[in-house]
């Protein structure tokens, strides 16, 4: 894995956090909900850094309908 691993500093502070339970194919709807509905309805904006995901289950070994993924979006 030539050059495929590195170090990244994640921003601290507040994050919007949503937990997705279900197939990976539905994960984009979580981003639509956070960015298109949740943030604007609360007068919040994204902060520095990119949104990221924490996979609480292994997508390769867990059934599709039992996936658990946290989506975290840094807030300004």
Model-identified regions with their sequence ranges:
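A solvent-exposed interaction/effector surface
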Residues: 1-76
């Amino acid at each position: 894995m030539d050059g495929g691993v590195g170090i990244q500093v994640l921003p601290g502070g507040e994050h919007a956090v949503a937990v997705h339970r279900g197939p990976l194919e539905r994960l984009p709807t979580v981003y639509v909900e956070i960015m298109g509905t949740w943030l604007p309805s609360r007068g919040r904006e994204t902060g520095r850094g990119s949104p990221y995901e924490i996979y609480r289950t292994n997508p390769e070994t867990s059934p599709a309908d039992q996936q658990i993924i946290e989506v975290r979006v840094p807030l300004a």
